């Protein structure tokens, strides 16, 4: 919702992904222009940018999908000098398929407690120019994060971190 509020009246492309957040294609959000498969949102936004550089491109991906297939898209977007904002919806679980652990949860598939892999550090290591984490329920902070992210000349990322509602 913060992205839609911040970008009101501007030319945008919203690239979706497979996950609970695919429901963002329905009203009242109505903000999924594309939805193909896990991880395709980031690479599709990159393609949009290179074909329509006056359009600000956003990709929406969950934390679990980011670890499964989003990292490669981020690396390619940085390498190919795309201007886009990667929105990671981090609820610290794999909610859509049964709350399985992933590298960001700090729990292995065998239930062993290990150090979490930091999404922020992964994005920074890949060369993302701006990485911020916000609470999506703090609308003022979230809208400002979007406004700041679109000013970045290159790949920016916003991690919207909140618990799963399921």
Task: Name each region found by the language model.
Residues 25-157:
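Thiamine diphosphate
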Residues 163-166:
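Cys/His-rich short segments
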Residues 1-26, 68:
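Cofactor-pocket helix-loop regions in the catalytic cores of large enzyme subunits
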């Amino acid at each position: 919702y913060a992205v839609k509020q911040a970008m009101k009246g501007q030319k945008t492309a919203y690239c979706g992904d497979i996950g609970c957040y695919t429901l963002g294609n329905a009203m009242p959000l109505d903000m999924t222009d594309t939805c193909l498969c896990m991880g395709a949102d980031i690479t599709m936004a990159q393609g949009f940018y290179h074909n329509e550089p006056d359009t600000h491109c956003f990709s929406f991906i969950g934390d679990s999908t980011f670890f499964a297939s989003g990292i490669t898209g981020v690396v390619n977007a940085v390498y190919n000098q795309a201007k886009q904002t990667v929105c990671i919806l981090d609820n610290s679980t794999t909610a859509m398929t049964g709350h399985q652990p992933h590298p960001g949860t700090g729990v292995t598939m065998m239930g062993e407690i290990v150090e979490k892999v930091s999404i922020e550090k992964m994005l920074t290591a890949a060369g993302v120019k701006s990485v911020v984490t916000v609470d999506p329920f703090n609308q003022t902070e979230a809208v400002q994060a979007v406004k700041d992210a679109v000013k970045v000349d290159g790949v920016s990322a916003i991690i919207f971190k909140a618990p799963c509602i399921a």
